């Protein structure tokens, strides 16, 4: 894929700092000045790297200019220009399954029990980083505390290893409060409703404050943004936007600006020389949104098992990471936990996670860490579970469908058995082995309740009616 960075860098020509904002676009400062009573701690420029993981909500690859999209994303584009862009990174098709997979490094068939829920006792990358001596923080969206329908309470941020938290949807799915205007947020577990203000600005302030307060020690910041998830709203920079497309466009631009604010804070604090930043998305773009990518109209695939449902941006930036590189290596969300462990020199996690460390690939020491990705997708009540395995260009579904994928247009073309020859035959055989070697037994039907008239997960058990007649927040 050709380089796409010149327009983005030109848009930032008025600023010399990483992630800086041209004066004509700058908005009022959102952080109060620090008290002058005591000198600020000095930033670390050596030792274990700080690590920041930014997770945009409902954001596929077509949303980034550096990936061929047509949105205004100069700050994320600059991350790609100054770091490594991964062109074959994949999340689960929906937010809760993705977050469970991302945080625990395990396949969903092992520990995904219900939408908006992660069971207490699960070990997350927050625990891993805290065990490594890092100060850990999370700012943004949680959605793991419980679904509000079956009475179970999910894992807390504290139990997941986070020293500090500032979160939307910490509580059960209903009621959850606003993520945008007049936001509801819980600071270290204490909820507060604000009558005014834009939620993403509240989150950004907390993220920047966390960075500044902990600049003298290694920190891990997980920043699962609420942008660009629907509802489509006007942002402080797009107050005249009307209609879903225009408002979504403004939300993408605002998300990018907040990334720029974070990068500017790293530069201002002298932390850009010892901080690794990873930017990605939790699943494909909402299906109401159609975007252009390299001349192709790409409909969002959130919730679908097609490539548009799983294909997300993945950009790594920081010391020791090749600049301006585009990698074809496959990246899966199970890989993040072992990657962070590898980055911080922790012991191998063999047998405890399904992912593999991508650190050698990110650091430019290896070309690939895996040859295929497996997914078990059972997101919520009324969905029949699906299993599929894929590499960069081919996908095999558990029901036998074999497709060729175009990762740019997002089109999947079924390949009949009679046409599975040569390269297609080789990939079919390899993916068939992945499916055969991965979990294929019945799951506990109590974990995935089905409604009357739907097949049970376990054919040997009767269908249940748990959760029927309710909408478990599938758009979250």
Per-segment meaning from a language model:
Residues 8-20:
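Bacterial N-terminal signal peptides
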Residues 21-25:
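Sec/Tat signal peptide C-region and signal peptidase I cleavage site
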């Amino acid at each position: 894929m050709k380089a796409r960075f010149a327009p983005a860098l030109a848009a930032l020509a008025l600023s010399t700092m990483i992630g800086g904002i041209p004066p004509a676009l700058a908005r009022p400062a959102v952080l109060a000045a620090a008290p002058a009573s005591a000198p600020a701690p000095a930033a670390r420029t050596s030792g274990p790297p700080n690590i920041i993981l930014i997770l945009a909500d409902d954001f596929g690859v077509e949303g980034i200019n550096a990936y061929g999209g047509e949105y205004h994303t100069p700050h994320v584009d600059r991350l790609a220009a100054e770091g490594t862009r991964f062109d074959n990174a994949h999340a689960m098709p929906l937010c809760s399954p993705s977050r469970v997979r991302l945080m625990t490094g395990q396949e969903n068939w092992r520990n995904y029990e219900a939408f908006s829920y992660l069971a207490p006792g699960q070990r997350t990358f927050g625990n891993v980083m805290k065990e490594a001596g890092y100060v850990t923080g999370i700012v943004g969206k949680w959605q793991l505390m419980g679904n509000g329908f079956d009475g179970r309470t999910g894992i807390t941020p504290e139990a997941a290893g986070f020293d500090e938290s500032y979160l939307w949807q910490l509580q059960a799915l209903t009621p959850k409060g606003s993520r945008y205007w007049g936001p509801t947020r819980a600071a270290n577990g204490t909820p507060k409703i604000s009558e005014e203000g834009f939620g993403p600005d509240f989150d950004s302030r907390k993220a920047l404050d966390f960075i500044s307060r902990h600049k003298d020690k290694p920190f891990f910041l997980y920043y699962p943004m609420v942008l660009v998830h629907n509802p489509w709203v006007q942002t402080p920079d797009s107050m005249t936007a009307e209609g879903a497309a225009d408002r979504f466009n403004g939300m993408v631009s605002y998300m990018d600006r907040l990334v720029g604010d974070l990068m500017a804070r790293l530069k201002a604090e002298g932390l850009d020389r010892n901080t690794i930043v990873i930017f990605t998305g939790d699943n494909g773009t909402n299906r109401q949104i159609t975007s252009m990518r390299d001349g192709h109209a790409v409909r969002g695939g959130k919730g679908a098992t097609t490539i548009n449902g799983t294909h997300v941006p993945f950009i790594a930036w920081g010391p020791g990471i090749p600049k301006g590189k585009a990698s074809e290596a496959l990246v899966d969300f199970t890989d993040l936990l072992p990657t962070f462990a590898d980055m911080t020199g922790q012991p191998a996690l063999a047998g405890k996670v399904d992912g593999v460390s991508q650190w050698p690939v990110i650091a430019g020491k290896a070309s690939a860490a895996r040859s295929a990705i497996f997914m078990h997708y059972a997101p919520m009540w009324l969905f029949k579970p699906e299993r599929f395995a894929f590499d960069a260009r081919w996908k095999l579904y558990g029901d036998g469908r074999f497709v060729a994928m175009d990762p740019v247009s997002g089109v999947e073309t079924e390949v009949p058995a009679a046409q599975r020859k040569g390269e297609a035959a080789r990939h079919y055989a390899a993916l068939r082995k992945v499916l055969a070697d991965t979990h294929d037994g019945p799951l506990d039907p109590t974990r995935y309740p089905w409604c009357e008239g739907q097949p049970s997960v376990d054919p040997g058990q009767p269908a249940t009616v748990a959760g029927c007649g309710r909408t478990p927040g599938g758009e979250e």
